[in-house]
């Protein structure tokens, strides 16, 4: 069972296992093995203790949701385990509520100099943008999955509770890392904005989050610096097309570019980081 924020994780895991074994064992795997996926939870690794044990912390979740597709045979009853045939919808819900909210907190929080996700969640200028973006994503999800409305409300409440969890001390750097991957058209920010666009619903605040992700420039993140380099030399339109899957003349692309331009112009030095954010210009 694969537990990773990766589209098609079940097929990916299947492929990786088959590539790692001999043809003879591959036949056994195909005959007897089942490949499935589970919803991921937020887990942060810490240091390694002297005895070799890994220290980690995570959200206080007690349920495990598993995709019924790909499982072979009947699983025994397991407490707090839910096996569902609506796994794709549940993944989308999680991505556009939990992960979207964390991304908004990380990228916009970074522009205000926040170091931790809970700081961004409590920041007077950042928190309203997070909540508005979540509301946009919620509306889009309810339009897409009307029979999931009550569950989507619970997802949204959980998302806000998670980012405010001081005990986890989750860092902006961890959540924001590799912004390029998270700007994909199927990912937490652009995907949510596209879903809202498809249902002709507002997505202005999601666009602010996307603009902040495009501007993320943590010097410790080589992916972020690579993104900034490409924007500097090739322009933001290239990134919107190749990474976000948007054509320059798409209304959504124009909206994102407008927010990004406001963010960049608000800094006299044209640095994209903390000094660049001015909420009044959004």
Task: Tell where the protein language model's regions lie, with residue ranges.
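Substrate/ligand-engaging "lid" and interaction regions
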Residues: 1-282
């Amino acid at each position: 069972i694969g537990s990773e924020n990766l589209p098609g994780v079940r097929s990916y895991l299947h492929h990786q296992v088959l590539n790692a074994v001999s043809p003879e064992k591959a036949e056994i795997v195909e005959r007897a093995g089942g490949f499935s996926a589970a919803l991921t939870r937020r887990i942060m690794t810490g240091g390694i203790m002297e005895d070799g044990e890994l220290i980690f912390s995570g959200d206080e979740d007690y349920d495990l949701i598993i995709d019924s597709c790909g499982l072979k045979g009947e699983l025994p009853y397991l407490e707090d385990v839910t096996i569902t045939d609506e796994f794709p919808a549940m993944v989308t819900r999680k991505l556009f509520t939990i992960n979207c909210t964390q991304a908004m907190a990380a990228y916009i929080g970074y522009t205000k100099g926040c170091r931790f996700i809970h700081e961004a969640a409590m920041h007077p200028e950042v928190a309203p943008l997070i909540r508005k973006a979540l509301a946009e994503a919620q509306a889009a999800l309810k339009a897409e999955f009307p029979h999931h409305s009550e569950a989507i409300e619970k997802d949204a409440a959980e998302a806000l509770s998670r980012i405010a969890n001081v005990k986890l001390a989750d860092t902006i750097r961890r959540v924001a890392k590799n912004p390029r991957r998270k700007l994909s058209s199927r990912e937490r920010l652009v995907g949510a904005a596209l879903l809202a666009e498809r249902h002709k619903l507002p997505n202005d605040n999601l666009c602010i989050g996307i603009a902040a992700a495009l501007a993320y420039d943590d010097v410790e993140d080589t992916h972020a610096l690579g993104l900034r380099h490409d924007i500097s030399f090739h322009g933001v339109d290239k990134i919107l097309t190749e990474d976000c899957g948007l054509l320059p003349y798409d209304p959504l692309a124009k909206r994102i570019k407008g927010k990004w331009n406001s963010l960049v112009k608000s800094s006299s030095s044209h640095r994209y980081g903390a000094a660049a954010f001015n909420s009044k210009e959004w």
